């Protein structure tokens, strides 16, 4: 607290109390200087003066320079009286303002103290036991991310393998269709050969029937010729021996039989060789077809296994993505809650700073008021000292 004081010498007039003090002028009456108190933000200002003895007239300033100044012998006249009255009024209003500001300042200090007691930082919480859980969750998230990347890589590899197997399957399927087309062509050739064989068998049967018919005709002709030859022999006994027709027919018969047998053997040999060749080709293509079918079956089984594995990997990936999204959402909600708490604390801190700034401005304003009051008090003091000198001069002149 800063205090200002000044002393007054003896005078012959009297003034009433200023603020909480009182001034009386008269024979043997003491004058106590006014007391001014003001404060802002826990600081105070006081102005006090010493007492002096006076006599003669009496007057009063009550309620903080709120009284009326009285003088005798025309000591205070004209502008000086008005100036003193104006200073009285202004000082009274300033004191009222100071009291009101002190009351408001006290209320603000009480409110700030209550707010700090209610909103002050509580005991610091120990979050160290959450760090292990957070680190474990981070490790799990990192592991899940790595596992997800590995699964994605495996899925890509499986997709590439599936594409490769699909290409092989399409190639084998095209080869199978080509082999089936060749088999169908060979079957048509086999059908044609079967028809040719049947035709040849029918031709052989026809040749056999024709041979039998020729044999029968030959025998009939031989019988007829024998009958004719026998009749001629009986008629012409003395004639020379004729041509042996039986031998000629027998030779012709043997030649036809040899030719027929040769044709039959040639046809059977050609048919047999052709049939064996076709059977070998059919067996080779059948074996190749069986191999292709078994390979296609294996490829289809492998493709189904890869598709099942792909579906399982996709399901695992979806589950991991859901887990990751849930974890991110949970941590996002916690982070948003913490951010909201931080924002609320920052807002409260901003309010406190604004209140502090406002109180600082109020304090500066009160200091300005205090400076002006000090200047006016100095002016008031100079006026009082001038009046004391005037009273002293008048007293001295009366004594003389």
From Swiss-Prot:
Region (Linker 1), start-end ranges: 116-133
Region (Coil 1A): 80-115
Outcome (variant: residue 35 to A): Abolishes phosphorylation; induces perinuclear collapse or short cytoplasmic filaments
Keyword list, A-Z: Coiled coil, Host-virus interaction, Intermediate filament, Keratin, Methylation, Phosphoprotein
Annotated InterPro entries: IF_conserved, IF_rod_dom, Keratin_I
Head: annotated span: 1-79
GO MF term set: protein-containing complex binding; structural constituent of cytoskeleton; structural constituent of muscle
SS bonds (residue pairs): none
Positions bearing Phosphothreonine: 323
GO annotations of cellular component type: apicolateral plasma membrane; cell periphery; costamere; cytoskeleton; cytosol; dystrophin-associated glycoprotein complex; extracellular exosome; intermediate filament
Residues recorded with modification Omega-N-methylarginine: 7, 24, 32, 43, 51
Modified residues (Asymmetric dimethylarginine): 24
Result when mutating residue 10 to A: No effect on phosphorylation; no functional effect
One GO process term, biological-process aspect: intermediate filament organization
Region (Coil 1B): 134-225
Residue span of region Necessary for interaction with PNN: 244-390
Primary role: Involved in the organization of myofibers. Together with KRT8, helps to link the contractile apparatus to dystrophin at the costameres of striated muscle.
Annotated family: Belongs to the intermediate filament family.
Note: There are two types of cytoskeletal and microfibrillar keratin: I (acidic; 40-55 kDa) and II (neutral to basic; 56-70 kDa).
Protein name (record): Keratin, type I cytoskeletal 19
């Amino acid at each position: 607290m800063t205090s200002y004081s000044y002393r007054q010498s003896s005078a012959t007039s009297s003034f009433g109390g200023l603020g909480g003090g009182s001034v009386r002028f008269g024979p043997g009456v003491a004058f106590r200087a006014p007391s001014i108190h003001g404060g802002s933000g826990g600081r105070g200002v006081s102005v006090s003066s010493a007492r002096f003895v006076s006599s003669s007239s009496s007057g009063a300033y009550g309620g903080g320079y709120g009284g009326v100044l009285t003088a005798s012998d025309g000591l205070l006249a004209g502008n000086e009286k008005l100036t003193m009255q104006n200073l009285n009024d202004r000082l009274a209003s300033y004191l009222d303002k100071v009291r009101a500001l002190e009351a408001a300042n006290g209320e603000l200090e009480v409110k700030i103290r209550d707010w700090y007691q209610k909103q002050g930082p509580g005991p610091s919480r120990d979050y160290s036991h959450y760090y292990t859980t957070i680190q474990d969750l981070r490790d799990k998230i990192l592991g899940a991310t790595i596992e997800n990347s590995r699964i994605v890589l495996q899925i890509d590899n499986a997709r590439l393998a599936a594409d490769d197997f699909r290409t092989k399957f399409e190639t084998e399927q095209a080869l199978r269709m080509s082999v089936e087309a060749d088999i169908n062509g060979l079957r048509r050739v086999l059908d044609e050969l079967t028809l040719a064989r049947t035709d040849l068998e029918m031709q052989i049967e026809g040749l056999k029937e024709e041979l039998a018919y020729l044999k029968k005709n030959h025998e009939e002709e031989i019988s007829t010729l024998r009958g004719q030859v026998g009749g001629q022999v009986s008629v012409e006994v003395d004639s020379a021996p004729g041509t042996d027709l039986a031998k000629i027919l027998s030779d012709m018969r043997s030649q036809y039989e040899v030719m027929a047998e040769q044709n039959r053997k040639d046809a059977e040999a050609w048919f047999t060789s052709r049939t064996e060749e076709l059977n070998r080709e059919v067996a080779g293509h059948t074996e190749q077809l069986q191999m292709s079918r078994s390979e296609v079956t294996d490829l289809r089984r492998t493709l189904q296994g890869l598709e099942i594995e792909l579906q399982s990997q996709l399901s695992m990936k979806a589950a991991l993505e859901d887990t990751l999204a849930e974890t991110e959402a949970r941590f996002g909600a916690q982070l948003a809650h913490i951010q909201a708490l931080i924002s609320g604390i920052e807002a409260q801190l901003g309010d406190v700073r604004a209140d502090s700034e406002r109180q600082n401005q109020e304090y500066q304003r009160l200091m300005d008021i205090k400076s002006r009051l000090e200047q006016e008090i100095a002016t008031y003091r100079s006026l009082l000292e001038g009046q004391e000198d005037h009273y002293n001069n008048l007293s001295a002149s009366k004594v003389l």
